[in-house]
Design a protein with these regions (language model features):
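Catalytic core of membrane glycerolipid acyltransferases/transacylases, capturing the structured
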Residues: 1-46
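Generic beta-sheet signal
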Residues: 14, 65-71
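Cofactor-binding loop segments of dinucleotide-utilizing enzymes, especially the Rossmann-like FAD-
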Residues: 19, 72, 105-107
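A cross-family acyltransferase "interaction/gating" segment
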Residues: 31, 66, 76-140
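Helix-adjacent hinge/juxtasegments
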Residues: 40-48, 52-58, 62
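Short glycine-rich anion-binding loops that position phosphate/pyrophosphate groups of nucleotides
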Residues: 46, 72-76
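A conserved mid-domain beta-alpha-beta active-site/ligand-binding segment of alpha/beta enzyme cores
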Residues: 129, 144-149
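Short, flexible loop/turn segments with low-complexity composition
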Residues: 156-162
Length: 162
């Protein structure tokens, strides 16, 4: 869904951060994830083991790629925003020249529910906010990002399926 927001000319620079344990588990999904989509794999199963699971994302940002990140650490369930994880703030601190654009996706959970393989034809609303830049404080950054996401959510049209 997010890849459709970008012109095809620069699409090779747009790379979703994605769970390596899911998208690189083998077979067709691994091939599609690497060859067609060009994911930045995040080894979330190694978090807390001393391995820097964000290093591939950091490297992609430093290389000038546009990396799509769900700041909750996953795409979540339904239309509710989960607690934001610190990873997005750590990346902003490490690569301050890379702006963070808050994006609110309304209806994405209905188009491709978590655990499903095939999308369901349905309309989605995508709202993109002004860029957020690192200013030196992790909690302030996360608070501002959350406030901007909540503002975008409030601007979204009413859900017709509710």
């Amino acid at each position: 869904l997010m890849l459709t927001l970008y012109p095809s000319k620069g699409l090779d620079r747009v790379r979703p951060a994605a769970a390596a344990d899911y998208f690189l588990r083998g077979g067709l999904i691994s091939w599609l994830s690497n060859t067609i989509i060009g994911i930045v794999p995040v080894a979330r199963d190694k978090a807390g083991t001393g391995v820097d699971v964000l290093e591939p994302v950091r490297a992609a940002l430093k290389a000038g790629d546009i990396v799509l990140i769900f700041p909750e650490g996953t795409r979540g369930d339904g239309e509710e925003m989960a607690q934001l994880k610190s990873g997005v703030a750590r990346l902003a601190a490490d690569v301050p020249e890379a702006p963070v654009y808050p994006i609110w996706l309304q209806g994405a959970g209905r188009v491709l529910p978590k655990g499903e393989a095939l999308p369901v034809p349905m309309n989605c609303t995508v709202l993109v906010g002004d860029p957020l830049h690192w200013r030196g404080d992790r909690q302030a950054f996360l608070g501002e990002l959350r406030a901007r996401l909540e503002d975008l959510k409030a601007k979204a049209p009413p859900q017709r399926w509710a």
